[in-house]
């Protein structure tokens, strides 16, 4: 794969950027501690069966190495082997899994996003990322309390958005998810959405 192809592929990922609002007040999941405690998935309002989650894809560096090296990296569970793109998609989308949000059992406050990796936002694109190597990059910064920001975006002065500025939707068939300031004007190729918390079993997830 040529350098130009690799550069084009990753520029597509970066250039892709739906405003998010969260409300836990009307959610009651059976068998959980309290009416608003436990684990939730976030469904897009008005788009039945579309959730906030992650899509995985094979990185360009993997495509340029031998099958033996790639297999060894896979068996070693190297996170960089399958980078994750935070996105919105349906339950039936291939290589997609919803993000599971967990609340504190004592306070019911959002405390974590179900991935074991620490999420952060790219300070250039604002994109939420989980890739293991990118958190050391110059253009990346950790977000303190990201789960709380996502659950209560208006209270924390942020907008969460997804956009299709070019042919990225054709290649990946999905937008990326980005964080913007509350007063930022979103690009005209962005579409505002709302998310609501739903119980995983009710959403079709075990």
Swiss-Prot record:
Keyword Cytoplasm: yes
Keywords, sorted A to Z: Cytoplasm, Glycoprotein, Signal, Zinc
Description of what induces expression: In zinc-depleted conditions and has increased expression in NAP1 deletion mutants.
Primary localisation category: cytoplasm
Carbohydrate attachment residues: 26, 48, 91, 139, 152
InterPro entries documented for this protein: Vel1-like (IPR019435)
Signal peptide location: 1-19
PTM comment, free text: N-glycosylated.
Localization per Swiss-Prot or TrEMBL: Cytoplasm, Cytosol
Family the entry assigns: Belongs to the VEL1 family.
This protein's name: Protein VEL1
Taxonomic source organism: Saccharomyces cerevisiae (strain ATCC 204508 / S288c) (Baker's yeast)
């Amino acid at each position: 794969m040529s350098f130009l192809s690799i550069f084009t592929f990753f520029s597509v990922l970066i250039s892709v950027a739906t405003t998010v609002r969260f409300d836990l007040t009307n959610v009651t999941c059976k068998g959980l501690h309290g009416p608003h405690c436990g684990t939730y998935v976030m469904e897009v309002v008005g788009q039945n069966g579309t959730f906030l989650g992650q899509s995985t894809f094979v990185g360009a560096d993997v495509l340029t190495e031998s099958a033996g090296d790639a297999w060894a990296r896979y068996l070693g569970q190297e996170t960089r082997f399958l980078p994750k793109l935070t996105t919105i998609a349906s339950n039936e989308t291939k290589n997609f899994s919803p993000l599971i949000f967990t609340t504190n059992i004592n306070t019911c406050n959002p405390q974590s996003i179900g991935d074991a990796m620490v999420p952060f936002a790219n300070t250039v694109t604002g994109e939420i990322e989980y890739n293991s190597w990118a958190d050391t990059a110059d253009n990346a910064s950790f977000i303190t309390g990201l789960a709380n920001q996502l659950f209560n975006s208006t209270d924390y002065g942020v907008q969460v958005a997804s956009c299709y500025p070019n042919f990225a939707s054709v290649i990946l068939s999905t937008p990326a998810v980005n964080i913007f300031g509350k007063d930022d004007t979103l690009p005209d190729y962005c579409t505002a959405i709302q998310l609501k918390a739903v119980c995983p079993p009710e959403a079709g997830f075990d």
